[in-house]
Regions:
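Residue-level signature of catalytic and energy-coupling elements of molecular machines
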Residues: 14, 20, 52, 71-73, ...
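A short, contiguous, amphipathic alpha-helix enriched in charged residues
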Residues: 314-337, 550, 554
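Canonical P-loop GTPase G-domain recognition
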Residues: 121, 131-191
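Conserved structured catalytic cores and adjacent interaction surfaces
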Residues: 2-19, 91, 101-113, 119-121, ...
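Interdomain boundary/hinge elements
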Residues: 36-42, 150-162, 196-206, 242-255, ...
């Protein structure tokens, strides 16, 4: 029986989690000496590399002095809370990675709390101690206080600490004495993290994630809880609702390095992948053929936000995308449900529309962005918060919001948040910056980020996570400015935009193709304004001497997908295609729009 350690890595965005795993892989001699592995081995989809966030959890394993260490990378952002909980169930211990300057951040707290509740043993790694003005000792104190406030047990509070710099490939027990390898960390893992318990008896395995291969179909991944699984064995699949299906394991794989290796049997405590089990879902149990016993299912966070997805019916329909029909979008959303636990999809009464609910704007925008890159065209409506009726009272989701700003901007920010029904819970000074904590309705957070950044000259750091449902807090003011809407379809000209600049801000560049009903800018007043941006200068006028002024254009405002989703009003859609992102009115025709407003 080989030695196994299952370990999850918890860290805030950008504290160097993925880099640390890269170095651990190198230390386990996964790559030949002449083979260049590239950076960020684990964040293997483009979106994750661009945003620097880990969305899906990955499994890799290294062999260190005869001990097999399974490393499980967890997503740090609470919008992917559904991911976090099932992943932690595969581990026996965790590494909490914190930045030696910033200390533990609110998002880390979310994952750490889940880990401590399950009873994982933590190891704290203070990373980036090579940065100037870092404060490792204070950070250590902060971590201790955080764990204490999360009700950690005495055993958990007695955690080992390792200092180092993952980027420069060293770890040490004392931050003033750099070493030249990261083996102190690996030794620490082997000594402090308990080996998984060997449970004898009938086999049980909990399915915590899945892989997909176009060749063999869906592959179940999970940790063997008890007993031994063998290739070709007959097993029972127990669903979350208690239904049972008899099935058979065709192939067994274990993780080795970055890939999977076929094997004949896997015993309890190791993490493996099963091929040939049909119709499983995440959270099901694979157990004995004769006397099946299911493991208790994990609770997954309920969705708090929903959006309308619909087929692209704009005049530019089908220009960029490969998949544009409702059948394509329907199949893609169904496929996403397999992997994405916290997602719900409901078909609307109207044809070609779906209500998609998730954990927050980030969760849903990552899905839209992924679909866009795969060549889908679709339109999305304004994000709506999901209300619940609890004991006859209408309730809405409340989030815990943390904003860290320089002192001089704090009053502006507090004013902005309280206007959106946020209640201040705590305020503390840390040097020249202030840490503000609020309880705030999710409705108020939609569209808040852009305003906070503008008010604080881009200095604010903002993070939020779902807390609970509370009674409805009343109306919240939304964007008050109207939109500027294109009058007819065609090419936008600098000449026309120049003449209209005093009406508001534009979102389009000259020479962009626009269509009637597209939102091309923000009006400076609260009503919508229909403008003609396709008007060009008449040629006969060209020769009048001295009257030819150059058009001086203010650069247009450009939106990211999240910003656009938070910006639009109820009667607007964001149109998303592989090459472009536009905002438009739901009803394109101006006269029809007026009619609808009157009724």
């Amino acid at each position: 029986m080989q030695n196994i350690r299952n370990i999850a890595i918890i860290a805030h965005v950008d504290h160097g989690k993925t880099t640390l795993v890269d170095k651990m892989l190198l230390a386990g001699n996964l790559f030949r000496n002449n083979q260049n592995s590239g950076e960020l081995i684990l964040d293997n989809n483009d979106l994750e590399r661009e945003r620097g966030i880990t969305i899906l959890s990955k499994n890799v394993s290294i062999n260190y002095n005869g001990t097999k260490i399974n490393i499980i990378d967890t997503p740090g952002h609470s919008d992917f809370g559904g991911e976090v909980e099932r992943v932690l169930n595969m581990a026996d211990g965790c590494i909490l990675l914190v930045d030696a300057f910033e200390g533990p951040m609110p998002q880390t707290r979310f994952v750490l709390q889940k880990a401590l509740e399950i009873g994982l043993k933590p190891i704290v790694v203070v990373n980036k101690v090579d940065k100037p003005n870092c404060r490792p000792e204070e950070v250590y104190e902060m971590v201790f206080d955080l764990m204490f406030s999360l009700n950690a047990t005495e055993d958990q509070l007695d955690f080992p600490v390792i200092y180092g710099s993952a980027k420069n490939n060293w770890m040490s027990t004392d931050w003033q004495k750099p070493t030249d390898t990261i083996t102190p960390l690996l030794d620490c893992i082997v000594e402090n993290i308990p080996a998984p318990q060997q449970l004898e008896g009938t086999p049980q395995m909990f399915i915590t994630s899945l892989d997909y291969s176009s060749y063999t179909g869906r592959i179940a991944v999970g940790r063997v809880h008890r007993g031994t699984l063998k290739e070709g064995m007959n097993v029972t699949l127990v669903k979350r609702n208690g239904d049972m299906f008899k099935t058979k394991i065709k192939e067994l794989h274990v993780f080795e390095g970055l890939g999977r290796v076929k094997t004949t049997e896997v015993s309890s405590g190791d993490i493996c992948a099963l091929v040939g089990i049909d119709g499983f879902e995440i959270g099901d149990t694979v157990c004995d053929f004769e006397n099946p016993e299911a493991l208790p299912p994990i609770a997954i966070d309920e969705p708090t936000m929903s959006m309308l997805f619909t087929i692209n019916d704009s005049p530019f329909f089908g220009k960029d995308g490969k998949f544009v029909t409702s059948r394509h979008i329907h199949d893609r959303l169904m496929k996403e449900l397999d992997k994405n636990l916290a997602l719900r999809v409901k078909k609307s009464e109207e044809d070609g529309k779906w209500i998609v609910s998730g954990r927050g704007v980030l969760h849903l925008s990552v899905l839209i962005e992924t679909m866009r890159r795969e060549g889908y065209e679709l339109q999305v409506g304004q994000p709506q918060v999901i209300f619940k009726e609890i004991d006859g009272v209408k309730c809405e989701p409340i989030e815990e919001l943390t904003i860290n700003v320089p002192e001089e901007y704090s009053s502006k920010i507090i004013d902005m948040v309280t206007r959106r029904k946020g209640e201040m819970v705590k305020m503390e000074n840390t040097g020249e910056r202030i840490n503000l904590e609020f309880d705030m309705p999710s409705r108020g957070i939609i569209g808040l980020r852009t305003n906070v950044l503008t008010a604080s000259a881009g200095e604010a750091i903002m993070a939020h996570r779902f807390k609970e449902y509370q009674p409805f807090k009343g109306e919240i003011e939304r964007r008050t400015n109207g939109s500027m809407i294109a009058m007819e379809s065609g090419t936008a000209f600098a000449y026309a935009i120049d003449k209209l600049q005093d009406r508001g801000k534009f979102f389009i560049f000259p020479q962009d193709e626009v269509y009637a009903g597209q939102v091309v800018g923000e009006h400076s007043h609260d009503n919508d304004l229909v403008i003609n941006v396709t008007k060009s200068k008449k040629l006969t006028n060209m020769r009048a001497s001295g009257s030819d002024e150059k058009a001086r254009l203010i650069p247009p405002v450009q939106f990211s997908l999240e910003e656009a989703l938070e910006y639009i009003k109820e009667d607007e859609y964001v149109e998303v295609t592989p090459k472009a992102m536009r905002m438009r009115k739901v009803i394109l025709d101006e006269i029809e729009r007026k009619r609808a407003n009157k009724s």
